[in-house]
């Protein structure tokens, strides 16, 4: 199903992962336990990760280790969150200082750590899929999910730089220089 995930496949996976289908969540809880157990095993060295591998296999193994680290970290904070089951399917990006990305509406994402500036248009439509104590609206998430919009990373440019955003609602400028800049309002 996920070898070539299209819009319908992703919507199905997200929808069925985040809802219990009326079964009381027993199967989902078992799946979460299995995922966390497997992730811990990878991190403890019980499953081969990068040893004895080279090239493409090593890169894939490193991705598995990174996903296992994220699963374990999130499972410690949100032990029964169904969104844990989605972690291995998500792309992990690490932004360096000055880098930016535009995450459009409907793109499933999570901030795992660090400092970031998030700019949104004025709205009241944040839809959460998990990893929160706030309300999770799975139906709205599935209805709004956009799986075709993969954001690209914009690299920093010295001096004055306006980050590219495909909307007219706002702009984000980065100003770097040797002098102090005072802004009066």
What is each PLM-predicted segment?
Residues 94-113:
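Conserved metal-binding segment of the jelly-roll/cupin
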Residues 1-74:
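Long, charge-rich alpha-helical interaction segments
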Residues 9, 80-81, 137:
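Short, solvent-exposed helix-helix connector turns and helix-capping sites enriched
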Residues 154-184:
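A short glycine-rich, His/Asp/Glu-containing loop-to-beta-strand
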Residues 114-162:
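C-terminal, non-catalytic macromolecule-binding modules
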Residues 109, 125, 179-181:
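Residues that cap or initiate secondary-structure elements
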Residues 66-97:
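Conserved AWS/pre-SET-to-SET junction and N-terminal core of the SET lysine methyltransferase domain
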Residues 101, 117, 173:
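A broad, low-specificity signal marking well-ordered, structured residues that form hydrophobic/aromatic
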């Amino acid at each position: 199903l996920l070898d070539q995930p299209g819009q319908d496949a992703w919507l199905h996976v997200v929808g069925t992962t985040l809802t219990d289908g009326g079964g009381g969540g027993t199967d989902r809880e078992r799946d979460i336990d299995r995922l966390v157990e497997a992730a811990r095993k990878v991190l403890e060295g019980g499953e081969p990760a990068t040893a004895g591998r080279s090239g493409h296999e090593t890169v894939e193994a490193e991705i598995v280790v990174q996903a296992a680290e994220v699963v374990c970290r999130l499972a410690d904070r949100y032990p029964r969150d169904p969104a844990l089951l989605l972690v291995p399917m998500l792309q992990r990006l690490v932004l360096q200082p000055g880098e930016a990305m535009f995450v459009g509406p409907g793109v499933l994402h999570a901030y795992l750590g660090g400092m970031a500036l998030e700019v949104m248009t004025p709205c009241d439509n944040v839809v959460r899929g998990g990893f929160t104590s706030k309300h999770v609206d799975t139906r709205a998430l599935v209805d709004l999910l956009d799986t075709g919009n993969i954001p690209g990373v914009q690299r920093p440019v010295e001096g004055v730089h306006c980050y590219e955003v495909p909307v007219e609602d706002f702009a984000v400028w980065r100003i770097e220089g040797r002098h102090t800049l005072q802004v009066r309002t």
